[in-house]
Amino acid sequence: METYDLCLTWNWEYDADFVKLLNLACQSHGLSLLQITPENLLHSTQSITNKEIVFQIFFDRASDADARFIPVVQWACNHVIHHINFHKLACRAWDKVAMHQVISVSMNTPLTITLPSYDEQPQLPEIDLSSLGESFTIKPAYGGGGDGVVNEATTLSQVLVARQEFPTQRYLLQAHIIPARLGARMAWFRVIYCAGKVYPCWWDSDTHIYTHVTPNEEAYYSLGSLRTITSSIATLCGLTLFSTEIAITSDGRFVIVDYVNDPIDLRLQSKALDGVPDEIVKDITERLLELILPHHTPSQD
């Protein structure tokens, strides 16, 4: 029987640089990494179910996009104690309506109307959209990368059409948040959380380019709430690694505009302009190692 410290499932080609960094970090600390990809998925699944392979910690970055990985995820849920983003919690975090209901209780979120799925309720009662302003955003409960999202919506007819695109999903109608300007930048941030550490970044919502918030900027603009809010979201969602988007309005409110993103895009900025700053990705691998090391089995040395 082979025992690994960490099992990582991944299927996105652009994860390769992150996986390389993680693998090098594991090797430097004497830790073993089992990578399960589409190429070795069948063989690995058989080896796991036959108890030829076991692992201490499980990290899934594939099953959200490829259902073929679900058997490995299910096995890990039943047999592995330690997870980076436990699947049950990740599934809840993927549901934007569920996250809105949890987060909006204690933190600022955009004014939001939630709708049942089209399959559940094809005909909607009369909805007053005036509270959302002149235009609003229509979002399905699941999905990322803008799939199914309608920006600058203005009419109920757009809502009725949009909710039929993904008829099994609930929908959110959200008022637009206009960020304040801080110096030369708009006060819109994407903040990454990993195992207790928070990485605040300026976020250009048009170009999707990250810029790490410097300590001087954080102090000068009083941005400490980005850390406390993100840590509070981590407590509510229970995930080890995720990102969130927060905007500061002209009246100084910190508003969570995109609740929980998982799995997060970990492309290196040196390889892709809209990737994550390299130093953050490298630090994330070190944070993950700190989770793995206490569960390392000495017999592997």
Task: Enumerate the predicted regions with their spans.
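A short glycine-rich, hydrophobically flanked beta-strand micro-motif that places a catalytic Asp/Glu
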Residues: 239-251
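Phosphate-binding site of ATP-dependent enzymes
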Residues: 150-237
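Short acidic/polar capping segments at secondary-structure boundaries
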Residues: 88-90, 117-120, 141-145, 155-157, ...
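Extreme N-terminal starter segment of soluble prokaryotic enzymes
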Residues: 1-7
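C-terminal active-site "lid" helix and adjoining low-complexity regulatory extension at the edge
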Residues: 248-301
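Conserved N-proximal alpha/beta basic substrate-recognition cap immediately N-terminal to
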Residues: 10-122
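ATP-grasp fold ATP-binding core
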Residues: 103, 128-147, 168-183
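Protein kinase-like catalytic core scaffold
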Residues: 136, 199, 242, 255-258
